[in-house]
């Protein structure tokens, strides 16, 4: 089964638009970007289009690379928009973690600030899922897969993919092993018996079809560039042995963006309830 990420994303955005229609106003999402290049601008254009599909507006605040952390944090502190996202990566001179940690819980649709990450990790029902976790959840649901009791390997331990996905799978009853750079040489052995593999290493074609077992569920959340093309962590030939496979592009990416805007709806609709 090859997952059609665009189809799932379209369904999520349509449901989100329906939920938002009860508000009587159009939610606004602030996107902060520093020294955006052509690729960043292209990605922001896609996010803007998806925001429109979800019944929202994406307002982009562009800053030069001379901007300071204090200036970005001041913009976050004064933000009246419904949600705030910071387009990563930030220039190396800036402490991305400090900037992200300034985002209030009630506006953190990406779940990248400390307050939102801690709330998610604690299992707080009143917080939203990180978008990639939401994408993994939608993919498993679309394939009628319950991870409970399964052996899962998460490749990469970053806070965008690996850490939150591993946490979520454990909470769903899977036995989870995390592969990092130190264990890369042992990766074939780690993957050999895995029922589910979720990769977010950002290492082009790191995983080949001879490393995974027949019928494994393979979710590729890693992206990198190879030969001028966007590729995933998994060689496309992995689809030949997988029972479920997400291609790159067109798999996890579109679903994660849709989940981002579903999170905005979650935050906006929760605000009147006094949760925050």
Q: Would you name each region that the model predicts?
A:
Residues 2, 85-147:
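Anion-binding alpha/beta catalytic cores of soluble intermediary-metabolism enzymes, centered on
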Residues 26-35:
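Short beta-strand segments enriched in small/hydrophobic residues
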Residues 36-48, 127-217, 229-239:
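Glycine-rich phosphate/diphosphate-binding loop of Rossmann-like nucleotide-binding domains
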């Amino acid at each position: 089964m090859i997952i059609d990420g665009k189809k799932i994303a379209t369904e999520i955005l349509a449901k989100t638009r329906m939920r938002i229609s009860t508000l009587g106003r159009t939610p606004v999402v602030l996107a902060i970007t520093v020294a955006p290049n052509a690729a960043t601008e292209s990605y922001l254009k896609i996010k803007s289009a998806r925001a429109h599909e979800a019944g929202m507006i994406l307002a982009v605040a562009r800053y030069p690379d001379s901007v300071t952390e204090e200036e970005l944090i001041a913009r976050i502190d004064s933000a009246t928009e419904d949600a705030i996202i910071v387009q990563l990566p930030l220039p190396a001179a800036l402490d991305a973690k400090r900037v992200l940690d300034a985002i209030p819980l009630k506006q953190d649709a990406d779940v990248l600030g400390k307050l939102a990450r801690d709330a998610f990790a604690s299992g707080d029902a009143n917080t939203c899922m990180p978008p990639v976790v939401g994408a993994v959840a939608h993919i498993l649901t679309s394939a009628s897969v319950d991870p409970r009791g399964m052996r899962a390997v998460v490749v990469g331990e970053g806070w965008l993919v690996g850490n939150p996905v591993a946490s979520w799978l454990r909470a769903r009853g899977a036995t989870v092993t995390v592969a990092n750079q130190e264990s890369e040489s042992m990766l074939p052995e780690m993957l050999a018996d895995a029922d589910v593999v979720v990769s977010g290493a950002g290492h082009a074609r790191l995983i080949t079809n001879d490393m995974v077992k027949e019928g494994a569920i393979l979710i590729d959340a890693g992206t990198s560039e190879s030969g001028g093309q966007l590729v995933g962590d998994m060689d496309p030939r992995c689809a030949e042995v997988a029972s479920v496979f997400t291609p790159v592009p067109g798999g996890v990416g579109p679903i994660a963006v849709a989940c981002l805007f579903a999170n905005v709806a979650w935050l906006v609709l929760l605000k009147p309830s006094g949760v925050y």
